[in-house]
Amino acid sequence: MRACKLLMLLIGLDFATILVRVCEIGGQYMSFQITFNNETKTYENPVTVLDVVGKDKSIICAYVNKRVRELTYTVDKDSEIIPLTLKDRDAKPLYEASLRFLVAMAMHNIYPDLKIRFSYNVSRSIFMQILNPHVCSNGMMVRDLQEEMKRLVEADLPLVRHIVSKEEAAKIFQKDGYEDKKEILAYRPEKTAHIYDCNGYRNYMYNRMVPSTGYIAKWRVRYYHPGIIIQYPRPEANGEIPPFEDAPTFGKTLKRAHQWAKATGCDTIVGINKRIEKDGDIDFITLCEQKHNRQLCELGQMIEDGREDIRLICIAGPSSSGKTTFANRLRIELLSRGIEPIRISMDDYYLTKDEVPVDEDGKPDLEAVDALDIELFNNNMADLIAGLEVQLPKFDFKLGKRVPGRVLQVPIDQPIIIEGIHALNERMTSSIPSHQKFKIFIAPQAQVNIDDHNPLSLTDLRLLRRIVRDYQFRGASALDTIGMWPSVRKGEFKWIYGTQEGANYVFNSFSTVELSVMKKHAMPLLEAIDMDNEYFPIAERLIRMLKFFDDIPDTWIPCNSIIREFIGGSCYEDA
């Protein structure tokens, strides 16, 4: 076995492929059956997924016995293969990683001396920034990039994955000028590393990829100062490239997050680990918490400056953004300025189950805005702002209906804080004049990369938060949380993201220390997922992100930190 593994390292093949070759030589294979497109065929020898599905380039990858597999994956036992296209959610990470490889290769070919970095969150696209001093992207660069990408796609060059030792990978990356990729290898726990080769260009995108460049044909490139936007098909857009939507309010927050990360040296995982090693746990935690304190101070000042008009403070954001902790900390910030807000829960305005609209599957759509009593909420808010005494509802989740709640009368100088996924939806507060509303959108906006070509996914960050929180407070397994995540995401695209540009302020709830803290909580939950489980590839992807972070103990995380909302120990748990 040791000799076999040595052979694997020497010739760049993974262990499964070695076994396939050995079995081929020894003639040890039994016949097996593969079901594809409702047709079952018998095979005498191992085949790749590509051999089965054919050369239809709309097929990006496939489920093999419910597991997402690349098209070059070898099948050697009874299996069911279901093709995945750009319309499918599980094909998106593989296509997006392949597209980043294509862009990096094209830029290397036409501008070999330029250093580039990819990041996310501009109109659901890839943002490419030029890192070289005094070099900025422009229209000519966009044209050159498009032409080279088209040439590579038409050439249909194979992308071949190799497994090499970490030492060999470090030599390759150093030779190719990728010092950032070499540095991150020091934090990789495995003794080997993966590298993809395409016509002599070598890189790795921390994901499996398509078999050849001909599969990466759908994209759109545009100039977007100070870099370049690469748009690509999205499953929520039915496999099409969604229209570009500029988001200046949201963009300012992203730019600010990037500036902070760059200024503190925390724009890469290596930078974060080095900062922890240099400053120590307590100083680094305090540094990260101070970023939230500054934002809260800014918000408090803005609301204080407009206190004569502002009566309703609306807080919304996607799942696991830290809305509960944020709302409580904002309340304390305002109290320190002599402003005494009162909180009202939008959850108390749910309709009964038989009144809730249904989704396309005929199930109650509890995330729809029409699942709330919009008219009653508007009337109650308008009456409270007018100084009237109001009988508020209280939703009894055991009874599944509203019951009478507290009676409330709000002084004219006392703002109301409402928090919920629909808090920024104009329908919920249509009876309140715009000048009396202050809207806040909250979401984690990490501008951190594994290396220059591999940004951390903000969606995966929120999924990690939710996995840890659901296990901590609801006893849910990682499988439970991952299984319901697509439904959560669907609701976010439908109801939440369209409201973010209407916000007066976007609060970045990401704490640079959080992944170093949550690692110890999340890793055991993810590692418990069996390799044969359909959600294993997602767990594997999250582990790939977490494993590079140095651990930090929970001890010094403040009780009012947003991180505490997920790992436990928050002073606001009963608030």
Identify the function of each model-found stretch.
Residues F326, L330:
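Hydrophobic positions on the alpha1 helix immediately C-terminal to the Walker A/P-loop
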